[in-house]
A protein has these predicted regions:
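A short beta-strand element within the Helicase C-terminal
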Residues: 162-164
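Short, acidic, Ser/Thr-enriched surface-loop or helix-capping motifs
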Residues: 154-155, 175
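N-terminal beta-alpha lobe that positions the nucleotide/phosphoryl donor
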Residues: 1-137, 146
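Short beta-strand scaffold segments in enzyme catalytic cores
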Residues: 148-151
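Conserved catalytic alpha/beta cores of large enzymes that bind or transform nucleotide phosphates
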Residues: 166-182
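Short, flexible loop/turn elements at secondary-structure junctions
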Residues: 79, 140-142, 155, 169
Length: 182
């Protein structure tokens, strides 16, 4: 496949096309050997102006046919400027959870399209990191009892002497979307 790679097996030449989130997941699996739900990344090269290229759509359809129908999936953004040193983009892009295998293409198109929203453009304009492009992570969905977000520096003060965590019961999307408070 040209546009899709299994997490933990992303070739070195493609790692600059998968965004911070997918790169972190790939490294956790490949180098740290952590128990991370299996998944795939659709590279930023597959997306142009918020739309999935036709060849990439073919690859996603093939992936849909290979995924287990017993599992559901989380389809998440991994923008090239997301989770970087200068900006987190937390909650800016769309996420779709609990997606059946046959809904992966539609969910991927929705997540990729979220890169072209006013909210994301405004956030990006306020940041110094203007790197453009969005990759999409497709990962087996785990239904959590609790989930959260950990910041490696205080998002209010910017101090990095300690970690700041926010947690909610249920899915983390409730927190990052603003639909639930920690």
């Amino acid at each position: 496949m040209e546009y899709i790679f299994e997490l933990g097996k992303v070739p070195e030449w493609a790692r600059n096309k998968i965004g911070g989130k997918a790169l972190s997941l790939d490294l956790m699996i490949r180098e740290l050997r952590l128990n991370v739900p299996y998944g795939y990344v659709v590279t930023a090269s597959a997306v142009e102006d918020g739309k999935i290229r036709d060849k990439a759509k073919e690859e996603i359809r093939l992936l849909e046919s290979k995924l287990s129908s017993k599992d559901t999936y989380a389809v998440r953004s991994s923008a090239l400027s997301e989770d970087g040193d200068n900006a987190s983009f937390a909650g800016q892009y769309e996420t779709v959870t609990d997606v059946a295998a046959e809904g992966i293409l539609e969910a991927t198109e929705f997540v990729a399209g979220s890169a072209d929203t006013l909210r994301v453009r405004d956030y990006k304009n306020a940041m110094s990191d203007k790197e453009d492009g969005i990759a999409v992570v497709i990962q087996r969905f785990v239904k959590p009892e609790m989930a959260g977000v950990v910041f490696t520096s205080d998002p209010i003060s910017g101090r990095d002497e300690y970690l700041v965590g926010n947690y909610v019961r249920g899915e983390g999307e409730l927190l990052v979307s603003g639909n639930s408070n920690a």
